[in-house]
């Protein structure tokens, strides 16, 4: 298989698995989803009810850090460029997840929800496509 095709396939699958892992946590903890959006900055994501998970440390950690498990795919075959795309996408693509987690942890309980709701409003303004649920 051509090198560029393997890289593109690895990136595509890594992005899909990253977002599906977020969705798995959302469904497992029954966090209500407000909308699925596609934006020009954050690519693809889910807007969820912030009041449901903001003050629960376990949900917060799993929602933001569980997709990093895909970084372990490199150990399947470290010589294959396809598997290098999983840690690459999940570390660099997950920087937003890191930022949101640590920003949330620095705010008080009341401010967390207000800040998250204002972020949701900003994301909705930059949405290219939105599907409300």
Give the role of each language-model region:
Residues 46-133:
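Metalloprotease/metallohydrolase-associated module, dominated by Zn2+-dependent proteases
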Residues 2-3, 55:
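Generic detector of short, locally flexible boundary/turn motifs and exposed helical patches
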Residues 10-57:
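Small-residue-rich helix-interface/hinge motifs
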Residues 1, 17, 131-133:
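Terminal, membrane-proximal amphipathic helices
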Residues 3-16, 83, 87-88:
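Membrane-embedded alpha-helical segments that form the functional core of polytopic membrane enzymes
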């Amino acid at each position: 298989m051509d090198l560029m095709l393997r890289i593109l396939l690895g990136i595509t699958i890594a992005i899909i698995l990253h977002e599906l892992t977020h969705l798995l946590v959302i469904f497992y903890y029954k966090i209500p989803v407000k909308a699925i959006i596609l934006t020009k900055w954050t690519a693809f994501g889910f807007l969820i009810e912030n009041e449901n998970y903001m003050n629960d440390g376990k949900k917060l950690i799993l929602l933001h850090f569980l997709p990093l498990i895909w970084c372990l795919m490199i150990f399947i075959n470290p010589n294959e460029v396809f598997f290098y795309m999983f840690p690459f996408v999940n570390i660099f693509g997950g920087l937003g997840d890191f930022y949101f987690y640590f920003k949330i942890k620095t705010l008080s309980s009341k401010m967390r929800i207000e800040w998250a709701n204002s972020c949701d409003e900003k994301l909705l303004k930059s949405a290219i496509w939105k599907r409300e649920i």
